[in-house]
């Protein structure tokens, strides 16, 4: 009996997610990721990344989750490869591209929704939020454990490197996700 249980547990991967660690891992990018750079880059797979001193809003989320051992590059690539029609066609792609798919806000939101991470609760530290900035622009950030009054701050990169700012209600919220 004990040998059977050991075999069963050996095949189960243990995943422990910490919202406070996610916030700290995002905050650690402040002063490191210094500029916004949306240029296309060929990157390693899995666990590929552009140079840490640059990036876009989604890179803040991707990098913080990687410290939690969650590789959105691999997860989104695999889900898109198996379910390509479920993802936005906004970029005219006819197939997946593991260099960029995980860096697109709409793809991240689609993946999180498909996995059941969308919530309607109050915002909590470690939650991930997406916005419509208008003009076809989207944005993503991580809810901080710090507040300005009653409003949680957001850790994000909207053009000047990774910052922690009061922008939660500045733009139209299009998604609210909790992956723990």
Predicted feature locations:
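Sec-dependent N-terminal signal peptides
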Residues: 4-12
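N-terminal capping segments
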Residues: 15-113
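...with weaker cross-activation on analogous glycine-rich loops/strands in unrelated enzymes
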Residues: 23, 81-159
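A structural signal for short, hydrophobic beta-strand segments that form beta-sheets
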Residues: 72-73, 143, 172-175
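Low-complexity, Gly/Ser/Thr/Pro-rich intrinsically disordered linker/tail segments
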Residues: 150-180
């Amino acid at each position: 009996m004990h040998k059977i249980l050991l075999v069963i547990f050996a095949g189960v991967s243990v995943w422990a997610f910490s919202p406070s660690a996610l916030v700290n891992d995002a905050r650690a990018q402040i002063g490191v990721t210094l500029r916004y750079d949306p240029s296309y880059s060929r990157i390693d797979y899995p666990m590929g990344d552009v140079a840490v001193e640059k990036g876009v809003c989604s890179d803040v989320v991707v990098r913080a989750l990687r410290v939690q051992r969650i590789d959105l590059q691999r997860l989104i690539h695999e889900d898109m490869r198996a379910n390509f029609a479920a993802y936005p066609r906004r970029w005219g792609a006819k197939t997946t591209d593991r260099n960029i798919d995980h860096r697109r806000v709409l793809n991240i939101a689609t993946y999180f929704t498909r996995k059941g991470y969308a919530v309607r609760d109050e915002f909590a530290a470690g939650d991930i939020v997406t916005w419509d900035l208008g003009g076809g622009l989207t944005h993503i950030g991580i809810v901080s454990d710090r507040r300005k009054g009653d409003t949680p701050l957001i850790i994000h990169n909207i053009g000047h490197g990774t910052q922690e700012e009061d922008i939660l209600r500045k733009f139209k919220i299009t998604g609210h996700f909790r992956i723990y």
